[in-house]
């Protein structure tokens, strides 16, 4: 699973995800992509599950690019522990995703295969997504 090799700080504030994506909104590598329609924190496990679903449907033909990286540590306290006594230990890593962000890109497969692969990958994610294609491709 994806996670940073090292970080400046061990724990992060929760924060809120405001506004729309200001970068990573266009297809840069592949001919087809999966674009986020809602803001959310996508966990490393969800990214990996979506990647597996996409590559499995493509039967390892073509290429997949993951355009988001889980760089935010999400902490949680153990179950049945009273409030207070500090912040919990980092539990997993997540990526903050804003609406309009391209999360996955694929190339080297026909349109029908790409659409179905992205549909299967989107089912593993907790947000609404949209399939996008380059203007040159038959969308």
From Swiss-Prot:
Q: Which Pfam families match?
A: Ribosomal_L16
Give me the Gene Ontology terms describing cellular component. Answer: cytosolic large ribosomal subunit
**Can you list the disulfide-bonded cysteine pairs?**
none
InterPro entries noted in UniProt: Ribosomal_uL16, Ribosomal_uL16_bact-type, Ribosomal_uL16_CS, Ribosomal_uL16_dom, Ribosomal_uL16_sf
Q: Which domain of life is it from?
A: Bacteria
* Ranges annotated as spanning the membrane: none
Q: Which GO terms describe its molecular function?
A: rRNA binding; structural constituent of ribosome; tRNA binding
Its Gene Ontology biological processes? translation
Give the UniProt keywords, A-Z: Ribonucleoprotein, Ribosomal protein, RNA-binding, rRNA-binding, tRNA-binding
Family to which the UniProt record says this protein belongs: Belongs to the universal ribosomal protein uL16 family.
Q: Name the HAMAP family on file.
A: Ribosomal_uL16 (MF_01342)
Function statement:
Binds 23S rRNA and is also seen to make contacts with the A and possibly P site tRNAs.
Q: What binding partners and quaternary form does the record give? A: Part of the 50S ribosomal subunit.
Name recorded for this polypeptide? Large ribosomal subunit protein uL16
